[in-house]
Regions:
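Proline- and threonine-rich low-complexity intrinsically disordered cytosolic regions
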Residues: 1-12, 20, 56-62, 219, ...
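Conserved short submotifs of the Hanks-type protein kinase catalytic core
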Residues: 97-111, 115
Length: 304
C-alpha cells in the first residue's frame, strides 16, 4: 500500500506514517484479521504499538469487514477507559485509508502462550504470580463495566521482569455498548470459554474469572481444562458440560483452580477475590475466604 502524500516525509519517501505522526518501524505480529507493528510516535518521541485491520472485503463479505472495523474501534474505546498497570494502555485511534488503527503501549514481551510453548508448564507459585496480575487487571476492567470475553494465554503478555498485562479487548463488551457479534455466534476462544457461554449465555465478569482459571490451569497442566480438539463444535460440547478434569500438577494452586472453574457462575470468586487468593498462593500462603463451589473433587493439596 502506497502511503498518501501527507504521510510521507521528503527526507525518506519509503517511511510509512499513520496519522502524520506514527512511524511504522517493524511488523511484529500478524494474523488473519490484523497485524501489529512496533512504531514511533514522532511527536512525543516514544515507542508505541500499532494494530492494523487487514481484512479486505470480498463480494458478499462487506458485513464482516464492517463488523471488524467496529470491533477494532470498540477495542479503542474500551481501552481508553482502562488505565491500569496490568492492562495494555490505549493511546489513540487513527483512521487511515478508511482503516482504523489502534495506537497502544508497546511492551517488549512475549505472550504467556509463547512462554509455555518454549519452556513448558509453570510451577504453581509462578503461575499464581502471573494470575494475580491478570486478576488485578480484570478487577479494574470489571469495575469499569467491561467484560474481556477472551482471556487466554495468547492475550496475556509477559515482560522480561515478570510484569503481566492483559491485551486484545477486541471482543470485549462494555455494559453500554451495542451488540456487535451476530446472533448465534460465540465470541471468544472455545478452549477457555466458561460453560454458560458455550451454552449460548451472555459473558459476564464471572465468565472472565472462569477463563482466568482455565488460563492458569493450562499454565500448570500444559493444556486447557477441557483438553484440545481440532473440531471446535466437539470442544464446545465438552465445555458446555462444565466437567473439568482434575489437575495433576497444580500443587498448591489446586483448591483455587477448583473454585475459579466452578460450573456455576455464582460459585466462583470475583476477580478481586481471585487476585487476593492468587497473591497468597504466589507467596506460599493458603488462600482464605473463597466460595465453596468446586469444579472437581479435592484431595490433599500437593506441595507448590
Amino acid at each position: 500500500m502506497t502511503p498518501p502524500e501527507s504521510d510521507v516525509r521528503p527526507e525518506n519517501p519509503t517511511v510509512r506514517r499513520i496519522g502524520g505522526r506514527y512511524r511504522l518501524d517493524e511488523r511484529i505480529a500478524a494474523g488473519a484479521m490484523g497485524a501489529v507493528w512496533r512504531g514511533t510516535d514522532e511527536l512525543l518521541n516514544r515507542t508505541v504499538a500499532l494494530k492494523e485491520l487487514l481484512v479486505a472485503a470480498s463480494p458478499g463479505e462487506e458485513d464482516t469487514l464492517e463488523e471488524s472495523r467496529q470491533r477494532i474501534l470498540r477495542e479503542g474505546r474500551i481501552g481508553a477507559r482502562l488505565q491500569h498497570a496490568h492492562v495494555i494502555s490505549m493511546f489513540d485511534v487513527v483512521v487511515h485509508d478508511d482503516r482504523p488503527w489502534l495506537v497502544m503501549e508497546y511492551l517488549p514481551s512475549r505472550s504467556l502462550a509463547a512462554v509455555l510453548a518454549e519452556k513448558g508448564p509453570m510451577g504453581a507459585r509462578e503461575a499464581a504470580a502471573v494470575g494475580e496480575q491478570v486478576a488485578d487487571g480484570l478487577t479494574a476492567a470489571h469495575a469499569a463495566g467491561v467484560v474481556h470475553r477472551d482471556v487466554k494465554p495468547g492475550n496475556v503478555l509477559i515482560a522480561e521482569d515478570g510484569t503481566a498485562k492483559i491485551t486484545d479487548f477486541g471482543v470485549s463488551r462494555a455494559v453500554d455498548d451495542v451488540q456487535l457479534t451476530r446472533t448465534g455466534m460465540i465470541a471468544g476462544t472455545p478452549a477457555f470459554l466458561a460453560p454458560e457461554v458455550a451454552r449460548g449465555g451472555q459473558p459476564t465478569p464471572a465468565s472472565d474469572v472462569f477463563a482466568l482459571g482455565a488460563t492458569l490451569y493450562a499454565a500448570v497442566e500444559g493444556e486447557p481444562p477441557f483438553g484440545l480438539d481440532d473440531n471446535a463444535y466437539a470442544l464446545l460440547h465438552k465445555v458446555a458440560t462444565g466437567t473439568v478434569r482434575p489437575p495433576v500438577a497444580a500443587g498448591a494452586l489446586t483448591p483455587l483452580l477448583a473454585t475459579l472453574l466452578a460450573p456455576e457462575p455464582a460459585n466462583r470468586p470475583t476477580a478481586s477475590q481471585a487476585r487476593a487468593a492468587l497473591e497468597a498462593v504466589a507467596a506460599g500462603r493458603t488462600p482464605t475466604g473463597l466460595p465453596a463451589g468446586s469444579a472437581f473433587a479435592l484431595g490433599p493439596a500437593a506441595p507448590p
